[in-house]
Amino acid sequence: MDQLEMKKMAAAAALQYVKPDSIIGVGSGSTVNCFIEALGSMRDQIKGAVAASKASEALLAKQGIEVFSANEVSSLDIYVDGADEINPQKMMIKGGGAALTREKIVAALAKKFICIVDTSKQVDVLGSTFALPVEVIPMARSQVARKLVALGGSPEYREGVVTDNGNVILDVYHFAIMNPVEMEKELNNVPGVVTNGIFALRAADIIIVGTPEGAKVIE
């Protein structure tokens, strides 16, 4: 079974958490694209969705699902998103698709965060296989990079990428993130940082892992 099939399996299993007449939150990325495609089968049963990226908004519209802005809702029953890494405590690194800030905004609206991944995304320590994305206001890029070096990281500017918010991304290598909550707070306090890709303060509530044996739910 290839990686795409495992992603589709996890995405399909997440449909069981979608309530009729609800507005749901969706993230962004390849696994979420599979979920949006599967969600199309329920378009007549839900009110619509709030998306964490312009790309996801376009895919939802293509499926005939009404798109709401985050400003139009006060809360969401569920938020469904993928991850670049996830640890046993359901904390994640996200932001490979540069949508991390909007993903945190929509996740914060949700009563339940459902993370859908394939087995390759499961790690014991965050930062062990994936660089940590940090969204930065452009004028602070060099200043923030120096601070990240001082903290022990090796930041690289993600060339040619501008976020949906008009900012830039620094990918930080060589961070073994032993205390994700404290690291998330510390990085977010650096002037010029919009947010970083550690999702520990708002971790997932449920993980659905697509495996060769089927979808595995971890609550």
Swiss-Prot record:
Coiled coil: none
Pathway: Carbohydrate degradation; pentose phosphate pathway; D-ribose 5-phosphate from D-ribulose 5-phosphate (non-oxidative stage): step 1/1
Keywords: Isomerase
Catalytic center residues: E103
Binding sites annotated in the UniProt record for substrate: S28, G29, S30, T31, D81, G82, A83, D84, K94, G95, G96, G97, K121
Keyword Protein biosynthesis carried by entry: no
This enzyme's EC code(s): 5.3.1.6
Catalysed conversion reaction: aldehydo-D-ribose 5-phosphate = D-ribulose 5-phosphate
A GO biological-process term: D-ribose metabolic process
Broad EC category: isomerase
Record GO cellular component, one term: cytosol
Family matches, as NCBIfam families: PRK00702.1, rpiA
Subunit structure: Homodimer.
Role according to the record: Catalyzes the reversible conversion of ribose-5-phosphate to ribulose 5-phosphate.
Similarity annotation: Belongs to the ribose 5-phosphate isomerase family.
The name this protein goes by in its record: Ribose-5-phosphate isomerase A
Species: Pasteurella multocida (strain Pm70)
